[in-house]
Amino acid sequence: AAAAVPRRGPRGGPGRSYTADAGYAPATPAAAGAAAGKATTEEQKLIEDINVGFKAAVAAAASVPAADKFKTFEAAFTSSSKAAAAKAPGLVPKLDAAYSVAYKAAVGATPEAKFDSFVASLTEALRVIAGALEVHAVKPVTEEPGMAKIPAGELQIIDKIDAAFKVAATAAATAPADDKFTVFEAAFNKAIKESTGGAYDTYKCIPSLEAAVKQAYAATVAAAPQVKYAVFEAALTKAITAMSEVQKVSQPATGAATVAAGAATTAAGAASGAATVAAGGYKV
């Protein structure tokens, strides 16, 4: 059976609650989306297609009256997500959840502010999906060129960190919003320590991992628990990806810590400026 298209908010669509408000001047249209060039899995390719559709939907909504913004955005964006639903059913619940979180989080004193808030929230929710697919799609490091330069133990720990992240993210996904941090932290610590045994503290990249976790936690300033966790997961995803890249070129552990922490800060900082980012799509 064909996969269901992700829900678009309560019956009648989000436009219903906004169209009753006074009109407002259209925002500046977003720049036309361009496909990014480094997708490596089918899901990543679909995410990039959705990114192009997302940018196009924002641009289309920017050029219509207030009463038509949500309807226009929804029509344009649904066509992109429908293609993803048909080709990768596993993306459906993720897109559905992203849209639901964005719809519930939309606030603003004016119709324009409400719509911008919705797009900003959806931007960050989609960023988490894209970031998770990126880190989960990193090739086993042993398949990358130049891996002979890195000690086998250091190569293995990268895979173990990535595996622990997946386990923890999966556990947190089913936990109540208020418990996501606790569940993630407990599952991540348990998985990484079990997989490395007594050698946990001997790996050079452990300091960078700890720095990344601290940066990611420190960056979660959003009020809503589900948004806090989404920002944290995106930040840690980027940090682990950065650590993997640093290890691949065999840089010192101090360099890995700097890159990983910087990636976490950058990812979280994107949330505070989400309204600006939204105009250009959610791809990093």
Curated annotation (Swiss-Prot):
The keyword Disulfide bond applies. It comes from the Eukaryota. Keywords: Allergen, Disulfide bond, Signal. Residues 1-19 form the signal peptide. One of its GO terms (molecular function) is RNA nuclease activity. Residues 1-21 are annotated as: Disordered. Has ribonuclease activity. May be involved in host-pathogen interactions. Homodimer; disulfide-linked. Belongs to the Poa p IX/Phl p VI allergen family. This is Pollen allergen Phl p 5b. It comes from Phleum pratense (Common timothy). The lineage of its organism: Eukaryota, Viridiplantae, Streptophyta, Embryophyta, Tracheophyta.
